[in-house]
Regions:
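Residues that act as N-cap/strand-start positions at coil-to-secondary-structure junctions
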Residues: 1, 35-37, 82, 144-146, ...
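Extended, loop-rich substrate-binding clefts of extracytoplasmic carbohydrate-active enzymes
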Residues: 1-47
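A short, structured loop/turn motif at beta-sheet edges
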Residues: 5-16, 44-49, 78, 82, ...
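Short, well-ordered beta-strand segments enriched in hydrophobic/aromatic residues
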Residues: 41-43, 50-58
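Short, acidic/polar linear motifs in exposed loop/turn regions
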Residues: 59-61, 225
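Active-site/ligand-binding surface loops and adjacent short beta/alpha elements
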Residues: 63, 73-166
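Active-site pocket scaffolds in enzymes
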Residues: 156-227
Length: 228
């Protein structure tokens, strides 16, 4: 359903812009979500990495609830070696207790010994047991600087893949599809899963966009050597 609306290539970068419109006349989503809106995603690929901006504009006459998340798989291994050479770190805070349907109950739990390694030291997330967990976002330190995002590091070579998010992201779902596949998904979300039905939706990141207004968020994927 997305259409490429702009594409520019220079010596330094490639930019692609895609747009998607939802309204009563052309989109089945409108039947279940009766708000007319425009979604625009802009990609910039350069020496800085892959930068992504998503923009939603409310074209309806009522406030539009909006929660944005990405199901982002990071391949592991990605630079040679074995699963055991790689660890993931993520800017996580408290863990969200999940019910039998994997929906947050509203209770926040301190990180256990396993998930505390996401903040410091790193956690092996492939070739291991299944992981399906949700967390509030809290910045970590990487090389002495505050960092808001996830990263995967090859401990043998020092090569790192960073997945950086802005302050629109408030929650992570981390999922490794059983643990025996060559990827793990640190999934950034603007609100806690099922936030509209929470006891305190705003505390879980719930937001609504006013008519004619826009909401945007930015993300960046890039590769660095440890210490750079």
């Amino acid at each position: 359903p997305f259409q490429v609306s702009k594409a520019v290539e220079t010596d330094d970068e490639v930019m692609v812009e895609c747009r998607y419109y939802s309204n009563a006349g052309c989109d089945v989503i409108f039947r279940d979500f009766p708000h007319e809106f425009k979604c625009k995603i802009i990609f910039h690929l350069s020496a800085r990495g892959l930068e992504q901006e998503v923009v939603f504009t409310n074209r309806s006459r009522e406030r539009m609830p909006l929660g944005v998340g990405f199901h982002t798989p990071l391949r592991i291994p990605f630079a040679g070696g074995e699963n055991g050479d790689y660890v993931m770190r993520v800017a996580v805070g408290e863990q969200a207790e999940l019910d039998a349907r994997n929906l947050p109950t509203g209770r926040k739990l301190p990180l256990n010994a396993q998930f505390a390694r996401l903040r410091e030291g790193g956690l092996r997330v492939t070739g291991c047991e299944p992981i399906e967990a949700g967390f509030k976002l809290r910045e970590i330190e990487v090389d002495g600087k505050p960092y808001r995002g996830a990263l995967v590091e090859n401990l043998r070579t020092g090569v790192r893949v960073f997945y950086e998010v802005d302050d629109r992201t408030t929650y992570w779902t981390i999922w490794n599809n059983g643990g025996q596949v060559p990827y793990c998904c640190p999934e950034p979300q603007s609100w806690t899963t099922n936030a509209p039905n929470a006891a305190d939706p705003e505390a879980e990141g719930f937001c609504a966009v006013a008519p004619g207004e826009s909401w945007s968020a930015k993300y960046r994927l890039y590769v660095r050597q440890a210490g750079e």
